[in-house]
């Protein structure tokens, strides 16, 4: 996609992480792994990097996923006051701006896979909302094929990917903002992992 603005992604829930671009990160066990029939997740209300979320800027432009605070502003979050966001356009303080070609990865902490990962996402600018992103699982240092490809709108939608093929394994979920330029921001919020059974 091209000529949009930003895709916003908020509340992604999974734990583990750390590493450098293009280097698989061995996951570590999350004590909050969902039990069968239960859900655990992340709403990004506390520092996601302290919780083990990591980011990668594979396009190398210096712009990446950011932890956004909507307190006292009109920033678009699904719930609470925080979300994660990645830009496909960067405003200039002097007017205008720069179209970006993001290939930005947001990678969760490690967790034991259940059946499903759900998340809420939206474009920040209603006129440039069609941000695109893919969702992947990282298991044993190997990144899966894309499990789902999504296009944002100006209102939050719930996305979901089936991770039952990885059930019982220690994994991470990764959100890749890419295949887009010249929109604005992708917002991601409330990521939840459902246990199997």
Which residues does each PLM region occupy?
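Extracellular glycan-recognition surfaces and repeat-rich motifs
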Residues: 35-91
